Amino acid sequence: MASAAPASRGAARASTAARDAPFAAAARGPGRFRRDGNGRNRLVAVRAPRRWTTRAAATSGDANVVIKPKKERAKVDPNAVLQVPPSQIRNFSIIAHIDHGKSTLADTLLSKTKTVAARDMEAQLLDSMDIERERGITIKLNSARMNYVANDGETYVLNLIDTPGHVDFSYEVSRSLAACEGALLVVDASQGVEAQTVANVYLALENDLEIITVLNKIDLPGAEPERVKVRSIHWFPYDRVGVREIEDVLGLDTEDAVVASAKANIGMEDILENIVKMIPPPPDTGDEPLRALIFDSYFDPYRGVVVIFRVVDGNLGVGDAVKFMNTGKSYTIDEIGIMRPQKVPVNRLSAGEVGYMIANIKSVADARVGDTITTTKDSSTEPLPGYSEATPMVYCGLFPTDSDQYEDLRVALGKLQINDAALRYEPEQSSAMGFGFRCGFLGLLHMEIVQERLEREYDLGLITTAPSVVYKVYTSDGACVDIANPADLPDASVRDRIEEPFVKLEMFAPSDYVGSLMELAQQRRGEFIDMTYLSESRTCLKYDIPLGEVVTDFFDELKSRSKGYASMEYSFNEYRKSDLVRLDVLINYEPADPLACICHRDKSYVMGRGLVDKLKELIPRQMFRIPIQASIGTKVIASTSISAMRKDVLAKCYGGDISRKKKLLKKQAAGKKRMKQFGKVEVPQEAFMAVLKVDQNAGSGG
C-alpha cells in the first residue's frame, strides 16, 4: 500500500499535466479556443511567430538558433538638441486674424513634428495665460524649436515664433517678425481676409519676409471641401473664401497656397515642406561680432528676467559678458538654452538660432523688446535697426473700491510692470474717488487685460474711469504739454491750441452694411479716404479718424451695426489741431473729476445732455435734491436734478391741530437744508462708465 500511493500520485500528476498541456502551451505562446469532438470550447495552442520561437529556443539553450536584432528605421530624436548649419535652420512666425486658427495650427505643427509628446498636448499650448485661453487670443508671444526630417532626407530645425495679433501689440509683432525670414499667413477658408490679416501682412512685408499662404479650416461646411482639387486652391467660390481678396487686396501670389485644416490634421505635411523649400535660411555670419535681437522677455520670480532672442551675428554661451546696446546695461550669462517650448539648457547658440538667456536681470525694463545684445569685449558698433520704446496711447484712472486696498493696488501694479514694460502708472487723487493711479496702456485691449489681471490675480475691487488719449496742448508762450487726464487741461485763457491724435482706420464688412458703417464713421468725425470692393459681397472702408472717438464704444457700435460681421484695424497717423473743450460734470455743485472728458465743441451739448440724463438714471435718490450739471468753464450747458425722497412725517398725526403738522413739515425742511449742505453723494461705478454710453449720434464736428 505504501508503494501504491506514490504511484497513484504520479498518475494523478501525469493526468493533470495532460489535461493542462494546452493551457501550458498557450502560456508559452498565442492560443485560441476551438470546438472539440464533443462540441465544447477548448483552448488550443497555435504556432508561435518567429520572434517568439527564437526567444523560446534561446532560453532553452539551443545553440543552433541565431538571434538577429530587430532592424529599426533610422529616426531623429525630436527631443535632441541638434547642431545644424544655418542652411538647415528655418525661422518663421504665424500671422492671422483672431479666430482664424493660428494657435490650433501651432499646436498641430508641434504634434506633427513630435516636439511635444501626445500625453502633454493640450489646446493653445503656446498660450500660457488663462485670459489667452478664455478669450482665444494670443497676448504674450512664445517660441518653440522643432526638428523635422524633410522629404529630401535632411533634418531641419524649425523655429516657430508665436506672435500676438492685436494692434495694441503691433510693435512686439514687428520685432518678432524681424527675427524671422518667413511667415505663414493663415486665412479662414470661410471668412476670407479680415482687418488684422491686412495689418500683419504689411508688417511682414516691411520686414521683407517670405509669405506662405495657408487657407485654413477647409473641413468646415462653408468651405465645401468636396470640391478640393489636387495642388489647386481655386476650388473655393471667390465670394466665400477670399482667394481673390488675397491677390487683389494683399498683392500676394496664391499659386503656391496650401489648403489645410489644423484641427483635422489636413495639409500639415505640405506646410512643413513649404517652410523648408520656400523660407530662406538665415545668413551664415557666425564669425562676426555678436548681435542678437530681443523679441520678448518675461519675469520669473525665481530666476529673474528670461530674455528671448534671435542670434543674428556671431555666437554666445554660458559665462559670456554681454551688454544691451540701447539701455547700456551689462550682465554675465548664467544660463542659455532653447525653447521646446519648455526651456532646454545648452552651452552655446550660433547665428540663426533662437533661444533664451538668464543673466540675473531684475526688470523687463532693462531688457526691452527690440534691443540688441552684444558682447562687452569685441562688441558690435552698430545695433540692429527698428528699436523704439513702447508709448502708451490710452490712459484711464484705476481706483480701489475699498480705500484700504490702495497699497495693495500699488504693489500689484508694480508686479505687473516688472513683466510689462509698456504699462505706466502714477499716483492720482480725486475728490470723489480718493486715492488711485493714472495708468497708461498701449490700447483698449491692453487696458482690459491689465484690469482683469488685477481683479483676478490680486483679488482687487476696482473702479475704472473712462479712457482718454494723449493730447498735445500748446500754451500762449509756445510751450507744449502732453495731457492725458482731462482734469489737467490748462485754462482756455492760457491755451493757444490743442492737437489730438488721428489714426488710419480700416473696416472690413459685408457690402450690405457699408452705408451704416459710413454713417458711424462720419458721426465720429471720420474723414473718408477710400472704399475698396474685395469681392461682390465684401468691402473695405478707410478713414482718418480721431483716436479719442475710437477708444470709447466705437468697436461695440461697429459690431452692432454689422450684426457682428465687421472687423476693424487702426494705426497711428499724426496729431492734428482740433477745436476741443473740457466738459466738466458737477454733482450737487461739486466737480466730479473722474467724469470730466475732452470732446469737440460741436458735440459738447449732445455729450453734456446725454451725460447728465444718464447720471440721473444711475445715481440713487437721497433725502435731499441733487442737481447735476455739465459745464464748459463757468458756463452750464446742460442740467437736471434728482428729486429728493420724502419721508411722510405726518403719518403719526391722526387729525388734530394743523399747527402740529406745520411744525413737523418745517422741521423736515430744515433738516433737508442742512443735509443738502453737508450731505455726500455716493456715485456708483456704473455712473463713471456712463461717459462711454452717451449717445453721440446727433451732432458732428470737423
Curated annotation (Swiss-Prot):
NCBIfam families assigned: lepA, small_GTP
Protein name: Translation factor GUF1 homolog, chloroplastic
Matches recorded under HAMAP family: GUFP (MF_03138), LepA (MF_00071)
Binding site for GTP: 96-103, 162-166, 216-219
Catalytic reaction equation(s): GTP + H2O = GDP + phosphate + H(+)
Enzyme Commission number(s) of this protein: 3.6.5.-
Keywords, sorted A to Z: Chloroplast, GTP-binding, Hydrolase, Nucleotide-binding, Plastid, Protein biosynthesis
GO process annotations (BP): positive regulation of translation; translation
Bias type Low complexity, positions: 1-30
Subcellular location: Plastid, Chloroplast
Its biological purpose: Promotes chloroplast protein synthesis. May act as a fidelity factor of the translation reaction, by catalyzing a one-codon backward translocation of tRNAs on improperly translocated ribosomes.
Organism annotation: Micromonas pusilla (strain CCMP1545)
Entry-linked Gene3D superfamilies: 3.30.70.240, Elongation factor 4, C-terminal domain (3.30.70.2570), Elongation Factor G (Translational Gtpase), domain 3 (3.30.70.870), P-loop containing nucleotide triphosphate hydrolases (3.40.50.300), Translation factors (2.40.30.10)
Region named Disordered: 1-41
Family: Belongs to the TRAFAC class translation factor GTPase superfamily. Classic translation factor GTPase family. LepA subfamily.
Domain (tr-type G): residue spans on this chain: 87-283
Molecular function terms from GO: GTP binding; GTPase activity; ribosome binding
Pfam (any one): GTP_EFTU
Origin organism lineage: Eukaryota, Viridiplantae, Chlorophyta, Mamiellophyceae, Mamiellales
